[in-house]
Regions:
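"A position-specific structural signal for the A-helix of alpha-solenoid helical repeats
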Residues: 7, 41-44, 74-76, 81
Length: 85
């Protein structure tokens, strides 16, 4: 079962409202920290809303938690973002 605010963040991203989605992902992280899906959502929302510092923070945390051997597409995206920003 996914946290409600994480799901709301996902819906807001689908509606192209990343700044609002970021707030929901951050609220979800307060209650259920270090969820892979929530961290990735927060990093994407931050990047799409132009908040590079938060995007870097969440992408870095995602990589730290998942480990260097993780090859999921989200991790490749995180590494690319950090390499170029």
């Amino acid at each position: 079962m996914l946290p409600a605010r994480e799901l709301l963040g996902d819906m807001l991203m689908e509606l192209k409202r990343p700044a609002e989605a970021l707030k929901e992902y951050e609220a979800s992280q307060q209650r259920e920290p270090n969820r892979y899906r929530g961290l990735y959502g927060a990093s994407q929302a931050a990047a799409q809303s132009g908040d590079r510092d938060k995007a870097r923070h969440y992408f870095s945390k995602l990589i730290e938690l998942a480990g260097s051997g993780d090859v999921r597409p989200e991790m490749e995206n995180a590494r690319r973002y950090l390499a170029s920003n």
